[in-house]
C-alpha cells in the first residue's frame, strides 16, 4: 500500500521533479566484515551441507554461516545492500520509473575477500526518463547508506523525528516538497505536512503480496492480471540492486564505473585493471 501511494503521489506531481533520493537501512544486524573461520565443525544431521554450498567453491561447515548469517558472506549472500535494498529501493525504482543506471560508485569500511563490509555507501546515476503527464523525470542520483551510515536530515524535518521506519527509509527530494517513506514503502508522508489527494491509478492489493503472486500463477495466461511486482519489474530492479554491490566490490579501481545496461558490461574498465582486497 505504501509503495502504491508513493508512486501515485510522485506521478501526480505532488512533490515536483525528483533529482536526488537518499536511502538507508539499519542493517546489517548480522556479522559482516569477517575473515573466513579457521575451525571445521561437524555438520548437523539435519543439514544437507552440499546443497547449502550450491555452486560456491566447497568449504568446511562452520556455524558462522547458518542459519541466519549466510547473507553476510560473499559466497552465499550480498550483504546489507543486497539483502535490504530490494525492500527499501522498490518505491524508488517503481515511483521514478528507473531502468539501468549509467554510472555507479561505492565505498565502504575495510573490504574483505570473504564477507561484505561492515558499512558502505553507493551512488547510482540514472538518465532522464520519458516525462509523465503531470511531472518530468529528469536525471536522478540515488544514494544508499548502511551499517550505521546515514544521509543528512532533510530540511524542515522536526527535531527528534526518527527517519528509520521498520529498518530504513527513502527520502525523495522534489522541487515542490520532500517525500519520506519507511522500509517496504511504509507510512509515506510529506515533510511539509500536507496530505496529498492523488487519484488512484494502481491496483490495490487487498491480500498479501505473496498471495497476490500465487493468484497470478494460478490464473490462465490469456487473461492473467499481473502480480504487484511482476518479473518484468522485479528482474531489472534486482539487477540495479546488485549493481550497487558490484560497485562496492570494485571500489579498488578508484573510478566512477560506467554501465552499459542493455549489453550488461562496464565500458570504462581497462583490461589490465587490478583491485586489492584483504
What is each of the regions a protein language model found here?
Residues 22-25, 56, 108:
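Residues that line or immediately flank small-molecule/substrate-binding pockets and catalytic motifs
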Residues 30-32, 60-62, 151-154, 181:
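Short, solvent-exposed loop/turn elements at domain surfaces
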Residues 3, 26, 58, 66-69, ...:
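Active-site-proximal cap/loop segments of hydrolase catalytic domains
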Residues 33-36, 68-78:
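Flexible glycine/proline-enriched surface loops and loop-helix/loop-strand junctions
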Residues 79, 90:
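Substrate-binding clefts and catalytic carboxylate motifs of secreted carbohydrate-active enzymes
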Residues 84, 89, 96, 100-278:
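Glycine-enriched catalytic-core subsegment of oxygenase/oxidase enzymes
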Residues 1-48:
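A contiguous active-site-proximal alpha/beta segment in oxidoreductase catalytic domains
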